[in-house]
Amino acid sequence: GIMDTLKNLAKTAGKGALQSLLNHASCKLSGQC
């Protein structure tokens, strides 16, 4: 249903945001930004 679709979208968006946050944090730590 539409709720499932929305849930999946939210999950995917959350994963993407978390991933980019982690990437940014690690590049800051290693001084590669």
From Swiss-Prot:
The protein's predominant localisation is secreted
Query: Biological process (GO) annotations?
Result: defense response to bacterium; killing of cells of another organism
Disulfide bond residue pairs: C27-C33
Which UniProt keywords are listed?
Amphibian defense peptide, Antibiotic, Antimicrobial, Cytolysis, Disulfide bond, Hemolysis, Secreted
Q: Which domain of life is it from?
A: Eukaryota
* One Pfam family of this chain: Antimicrobial_2
Q: What does this protein do?
A: Shows antibacterial activity against representative Gram-negative and Gram-positive bacterial species, and hemolytic activity.
The family assignment reads:
Belongs to the frog skin active peptide (FSAP) family. Brevinin subfamily.
Protein name, entry field: Brevinin-2Eg
